[in-house]
Design a protein with these regions (language model features):
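Active-site core of bacterial EAL-family cyclic-dinucleotide phosphodiesterase domains
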Residues: 1-70, 108, 169, 224, ...
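Catalytic core of bacterial c-di-GMP phosphodiesterases, primarily the EAL and HD-GYP domains
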Residues: 4, 10-12, 40-49, 76-152, ...
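Structural preference for long, well-ordered alpha-helical segments in enzyme cores
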Residues: 17-20, 24, 50-51, 66, ...
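C-terminal helical cap(s) of enzyme catalytic domains, especially alpha/beta-barrels
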Residues: 21, 237, 253-269
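Conserved ATPase "switch" residues in P-loop NTPase domains
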Residues: 25, 96, 161, 266
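The catalytic core of metal-dependent phosphodiesterases that act on cyclic dinucleotides
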Residues: 105, 124-200, 214-252
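Conserved N-terminal phosphate-binding loop of PLP-dependent enzymes in the Aspartate aminotransferase
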Residues: 209
Length: 269
């Protein structure tokens, strides 16, 4: 096999990024931003999705697309993922007085986390000693990740839900079909993949698919992500979608930004 200079440069760049990420963990350079989830019928803020960000002191905010794959490939995501759960729950405590009710806090779970044998215990350790009643924890796991080993994952997710943690299956409809298993999956909510909403107001096929998904999941909470226009929001309300999330309502916010958002929350309708 012949190696081109470009290949060597690529390997060196990856190794350098790995070293920077190790340093980022040691120096606590990771932060969380949050995007609100809105109840469609009332416009009320009902939750926040925590989004991992890397605040590099030299480069500023680094795109998640650049560093999350490396965290997953190297196994560093196990440590960072546990930190994200605790950090999100800790930061959310400050929002309770200004919100006036339970505010669900969603944290994304990567495939490498879910496949760990001790994943259930790691979640238990992450929430140990934290009050999750006022800010219930949600774990968002993609449909394709759940379906990779559906029988094993059903067992893990059921054990986690028994702790009082909600399970959201995200990117629903984008990959492996979970419909045959939907009745058996211990999930509280489905988050419909954002690809459906790019054309939901212009193509009848997209609208039919979204309407069908909402109807099939009538016993679950259905969340639409990637809602960026008032027309999309209006149609989703007509289709009885339970919750919405997207830049129409708010771009991802810092923890301080969430506090300000909740104080002046006035959601576009």
């Amino acid at each position: 096999m012949f190696y081109e200079p470009e290949m060597n440069a690529g390997v060196a760049e990856t190794l350098m990024l790995e070293n920077r990420l190790h340093r980022a963990i040691e120096q606590q350079q990771f932060i969380l931003h949050y995007q609100p989830k809105i109840e469609s019928a009332t416009g009320r803020v009902v939750g926040m999705e925590a989004l991992l960000r890397w605040q590099d002191p030299d480069c500023g905010l680094v795109s998640p697309a650049e560093f999350i794959p490396i965290l997953e490939e190297t196994g560093m995501m196990l440590e960072v993922g546990t930190w994200a759960m605790r950090q999100a729950l800790t930061e959310s405590r400050a929002w309770r007085p200004m919100h006036g009710g339970p505010l669900r806090i969603a944290v994304n779970v990567s495939p490498v986390q879910l496949e760990q044998r001790d994943f259930v215990d790691s979640v238990r350790r992450a929430i140990d000693g934290l009050d999750i009643e006022g800010s219930p924890l949600e774990l968002e796991i993609t449909e394709s990740t759940v379906m990779d080993d559906v029988d094993e994952n059903i067992s893990k997710l059921a054990a986690i839900r028994d702790m009082g943690v909600n399970i959201v299956m995200s990117d629903f409809g984008a990959g492996h079909s979970s419909l045959p298993h939907l009745a058996d999956l211990p999930v509280n909510a489905l988050k419909i993949d954002r690809s459906f909403f790019a054309t939901v107001t212009t193509k009848s096929h997209s609208m039919t698919l979204v309407s069908t998904i909402i109807s099939l999941a009538h016993a679950l909470t259905v969340i639409a992500e990637g809602v960026d226009s008032a027309d999309q929001a209006k149609l989703l309300r007509l289709l009885k979608c339970d919750e919405m999330q997207g830049n129409l309502f708010s771009k991802p916010l810092s923890a301080d930004g969430v506090a300000k958002f909740l104080q002046r929350a006035s959601v576009p309708r």
